[in-house]
Amino acid sequence: LTPVHDGYEATLTDGSTLIVDTVLCATGRHPNIEGLGLEHTKVTLDSRGYVKADAQFQTEEPSIFALGDMTGGPQLTPVAIAQAMAFAHTHFGNDSKVMDYEFIPTAVFSQPNIGTVGLTEESARDLGLELQIFKSDFKPMKHTLSGRDERTLMKLIVDKSTDRVIGLHMVGPDAGEICQGMAVAM
């Protein structure tokens, strides 16, 4: 990155350049396990420093369970909530539940919102599924009277053999919230 009068000149790995006004530096995440005393237990860590746990959230230490961001899976609020529910059902409700990661809603709360849940068209095709793809570009109903020209883009991926929605991808107002509701239906 080189500062220029209009922002920054970014040199890409292929040698090409582009001028940008904003740079987002995403440095990643690491588990915050310092001070927990795990070194005095049988708990093991993976190569990235995340706690290893099985499908029931059991670590190598019989009295220690691990779930959420410290286990290295998708670091999303809906995942942590679903893991907590599965853990509670299994360990306190006598109803064994295994976490299902298939339809995790994700959102980028930017302007406009970006939301997604389920499979992408590419990943569904890689599974050999015959698909129906539905795309829509529309003005949200809440803007009918306001006169705002904000648009929403939506794409549904449907398994043709079952007529089941297996993916939803959306850009527009409240996309993250809408995808969370769709995840429940899916």
Range-by-range predicted roles:
Residues 4-18, 23:
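Conserved beta-strand-loop-beta-strand element in the redox core of flavoprotein oxidoreductases
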Residues 12-14, 55, 160:
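Short acidic, glycine-rich loop/turn motifs
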Residues 2-4, 46, 157-161:
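Short beta-strand micro-motifs enriched in acidic
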Residues 1-8, 74, 78-107, 111:
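Glycine-rich flavin
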Residues 17-93, 184:
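FAD-site-proximal beta/loop scaffold in flavoenzymes
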Residues 3-8, 61, 147-152:
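A short, glycine/Asx- and small/polar-enriched loop/turn
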Residues 92-93, 104, 109-186:
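Flexible, glycine-rich terminal cap/loop adjacent to redox cofactors
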Residues 4-10, 43-52, 139:
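Short gly/ser/thr-rich secondary-structure transition/capping motifs
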